[in-house]
Amino acid sequence: MPLFQKEIALKLDIPENIENIKPYPPGKPLDELEREYGITDSIKLASNENPWGASPKAIKAIGESLGDMQRYPDGSAYYLTEAIAKYAGVGMSEIILGNGSNEVIEFLVKAFVQDDSEVITSHPSFLMYQKFVQVRGGVNRVIPLKDMHHDLQTILDTVNEKTRLIFIDNPNNPTGTYLEPELLIDFINSLPEHVILVLDEAYVDFMDLDKWLDVPSLIKNQAGRCGIVSLRTFSKAYGLSGLRVGFGLMAEEIVTCLHKVRQPFNVNSLAQVGALAALGDVDFYEQTLLKNRQGMKWLMKEIKGLGCEPFASQTNFFLIDVQGNADKLYTEMLYKGVIIRSMSAYGYPHYIRVTVGTTVENKRFLKALSDCLKELNYV
């Protein structure tokens, strides 16, 4: 009898909450598009990455650290944590690092959600909030956006004694909308003490300063009765998506709890070195923000000229009402070597989401969009 019998199927007892989860749909990679469609020189404006690359200082620092890869990383990420504390104006004990800020989301759910716990999220927003809760066996309470903004009053009305976490991405992904600081302060002051409010600020770097709430100072001064968490990432403005490094700012008591569910060495050595260097590369950071603002302004004007309506955004991406089937437009754009995001899966069947690119990418996108709109008779 052969040692292995290929035709015997595994009989797995998969928990229902796991069986019902749909894997996260990442943006289509460039090499996959070029393999499937037989094209070259394609561009990707779908995943809100930094089109100007990574910080040169980060690249240099990583190159100089390649000889130390046989060593485990510093499990405390001391120097990166120290730099973040100085940057954010909080104590080192009020910071936790993650393999991307999404890992900090996972820490929070692992630490505070049980079978009967409830977590409030908005729809649409980052899909992983709900997935982590579902894996843990908690209950998702999903509140639809109101006029493409978080519906704070309905969220408040949904809070009960079982509510443990509230996730609010500010600015919101995929709409790019934000919450006025005064509204957010009132919301925080209305929350009970048993709730932790998680403000996902992945795109906060791109916001106008007068529209930004200084969440780190709220955390430092223990404002409100509820726990407050700010999630940040090096994936967007700092251009380090491939390194997977983010962090959370929160009260020391919450950090202590999250360390209990954190894997050792969760942020690798190169990510620590690269993020530390990127944090100090102010020139690259400021140039990224400037170029993003310039590109956003140009695209908004040109897209309106095509007869479409772009949606105002405080991020590095924006929505466009294409006045037709977004999935069809997405497919047609692929044939022209341009990857964008259809928003039909988010409940917006006539919208696409586009990342601001370089000047060359923006012009190529606009030409492809113009051609596709005409070919599909959308305008």
Curated annotation (Swiss-Prot):
<dbReference type="GO" id="GO:0004400">
    <property type="term" value="F:histidinol-phosphate transaminase activity"/>
</dbReference>
<dbReference type="InterPro" id="IPR015422">
    <property type="entry name" value="PyrdxlP-dep_Trfase_small"/>
</dbReference>
<comment type="pathway">
    <text>Amino-acid biosynthesis; L-histidine biosynthesis; L-histidine from 5-phospho-alpha-D-ribose 1-diphosphate: step 7/9.</text>
</comment>
<keyword id="KW-0808">Transferase</keyword>
<keyword id="KW-0663">Pyridoxal phosphate</keyword>
<keyword id="KW-0368">Histidine biosynthesis</keyword>
<dbReference type="InterPro" id="IPR050106">
    <property type="entry name" value="HistidinolP_aminotransfase"/>
</dbReference>
<comment type="subunit">
    <text>Homodimer.</text>
</comment>
<dbReference type="InterPro" id="IPR015421">
    <property type="entry name" value="PyrdxlP-dep_Trfase_major"/>
</dbReference>
<dbReference type="InterPro" id="IPR004839">
    <property type="entry name" value="Aminotransferase_I/II_large"/>
</dbReference>
<dbReference type="GO" id="GO:0000105">
    <property type="term" value="P:L-histidine biosynthetic process"/>
</dbReference>
<dbReference type="InterPro" id="IPR005861">
    <property type="entry name" value="HisP_aminotrans"/>
</dbReference>
<feature type="modified residue" description="N6-(pyridoxal phosphate)lysine">
    <location>
        <position position="236"/>
    </location>
</feature>
<dbReference type="InterPro" id="IPR001917">
    <property type="entry name" value="Aminotrans_II_pyridoxalP_BS"/>
</dbReference>
<keyword id="KW-0028">Amino-acid biosynthesis</keyword>
<dbReference type="InterPro" id="IPR015424">
    <property type="entry name" value="PyrdxlP-dep_Trfase"/>
</dbReference>
<comment type="similarity">
    <text>Belongs to the class-II pyridoxal-phosphate-dependent aminotransferase family. Histidinol-phosphate aminotransferase subfamily.</text>
</comment>
<protein>
    <recommendedName>
        <fullName>Histidinol-phosphate aminotransferase</fullName>
        <ecNumber>2.6.1.9</ecNumber>
    </recommendedName>
</protein>
<dbReference type="Pfam" id="PF00155">
    <property type="entry name" value="Aminotran_1_2"/>
</dbReference>
<dbReference type="GO" id="GO:0030170">
    <property type="term" value="F:pyridoxal phosphate binding"/>
</dbReference>
<keyword id="KW-0032">Aminotransferase</keyword>
